[in-house]
Amino acid sequence: VGIMLRLWAEPPADGADEDAAPTRENACCSIESMSDARRVAAQLDIPFYVINVEEPFRETIVDYFYDEYRAGRTPNPCLRCNRTIRFTLLLERALALGADYLATGHYVRVDDDPVTGLRRLRRASDTAKDQSYVLHVLSQYQLSYALFPLGEYTKPEVRAMAAERGLPVATKAESQEICFVAANDYRGFVRRYAEARGMPAPEPGPILDLSGRQLGAHSGLANYTVGQRKGLGIAAREPLHVLQLDGARNAVIVGPAAALERACFTVHQTTWTRDTPPDGPVRVEVKVRYKAQPVSGLVTPLPDGRAEAMLEQPIRAVTPGQAAVFYGGAAGDEVLGGGLIE
């Protein structure tokens, strides 16, 4: 059985024909994507269903994305989508249709631990395409139904297999943008979303140095990110970078590049792929962004679903709202868990 989700898409721009398709289609479920999926299902001679989850997607993912940016955090909506939409709502629908497993096109591997029998989430063979970072939120229950057939292959190998089978999507371009944000313009999206739904728009506020001295004014926290240097609109003797987005004061804190480095930080909303945290500190590799290089360190579970990461060497731009994901296991490629950076 083939299933595709119809996700929320931004409404047409002012003046557009309301009866026409949205001018800013969701990249994951555009009319073209649905047509392609339907053609593949027909070629494979399997049933094909489109399941509408627009409203739960908007409430759970899009509102969260907006709220996080307005609060001065930098969210990764794919994490929440994978846990609550793809591997909850979609999994429920798949099981209701009589499916035994849910197979997706993520580049990641899953297998059983030979000692404990628990499901293990592991990096893909093609490390350049590995998507384990955005799947660290999955539970044992979700992993028990998950299949990731692409995890052992490279992207060129997958395209070659699709071409051999005559599938019409063999050469289709891939998208790495946030699916509901057109042209990756998240600043414009936050502004438009606030206007369309009558929500508070990002408000201007002060740009402060580390001593609290005001150096200038910002146009709204959503327009900045930790590590940013260009576009601050302030003159200084040395290059200044965004160090912190202070939601409580609606302030952008800036300072020298050296102040961006951190070797210790905490995370909250921590999840563990084996469902229970380790008994104590664990040697791990930590990734703080999707495309970041992993750094060796020690992670220690804390009360209230939190954890502390201590890295062997400091890294730059550890960004609140992004996930820190912990890797370990015998081969070092197992996803142990992760949490949102505080």
Task: Please identify what each model-predicted range represents.
Residues 103-110, 114-342:
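AMP-forming adenylation/ATP pyrophosphatase catalytic core
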Residues 1-136, 147, 157-158, 242:
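ATP-dependent adenylation/nucleotidyltransferase module used to activate substrates
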